[in-house]
Amino acid sequence: MKVSYHGHSVVKIETNGKVILIDPFLTGNPKTDLKAEDVKVDAILLSHGHGDHVGDTVELAKKNNAVVVAPFELATFLSWQGVNTHPMHIGGSHEFDFGKVKFTQAFHGSSYIDEENKTITYTGMPAGILFTAEEKTLYHAGDTALFSDMKLIGELNNIDVAFLPIGDNFTMGPEDAVLAAKWVQAKTVVPMHYNTFPVIEQDPYQFVEKLQNCTGKVLEAGESITL
């Protein structure tokens, strides 16, 4: 399984001849190396409904006939826009032809904000994502605060790589993320959701230096690891 990072919370997985994107915020993302018009994708996994995570989902899904796997309310909202969706919910798992997906808790919000009409649409509970293929497991924490049940996620799953937000302000910051890394017990931890905007500026190298009992890896946009 090849896993690459593409800025903010964008993660690409290549496995079993399939390409999976998590939270494809490409257009308007100053930290990504990807352009929506160039992306080929078979499935899109969404952690929650905020614009910096849903991103280019509708365009990508329609262009590639890709399935969008998302929490129930968000999946329903996107299906109304003509997208092929597979709704799930927290604690549920499903075996797809590209791998197994399970949604975990995340402590955050989830909504679609229409600035023009000044409306906010609730899009369900936010989630973390466990993805398993080729006997390897990736944990994408989504946007979240530190929470004690991360210990349970670590106890129940043999996590090979975890992507954890470190930006602070909207999510946990580096200090909390160090504790999260300890709790989820991943072999490798990659920081995400930082330096996209001034309010979430952090030094990822300082973060990985503080990690214990795991390998910390800072991935620049386009860099990958193989599990």
UniProtKB/Swiss-Prot annotation:
Keyword Hydrolase on entry: yes
Gene3D superfamilies: Ribonuclease Z/Hydroxyacylglutathione hydrolase-like (3.60.15.10)
Highest rank taxon of the organism: Bacteria
Pfam families: Lactamase_B_2 (PF12706)
Gene Ontology MF term list: hydrolase activity
Keywords: Hydrolase
Family that this chain belongs to: Belongs to the UPF0173 family.
The name this protein goes by in its record: UPF0173 metal-dependent hydrolase BA_4860/GBAA_4860/BAS4507
Organism: Bacillus anthracis
Organism lineage: Bacteria, Bacillati, Bacillota, Bacilli, Bacillales
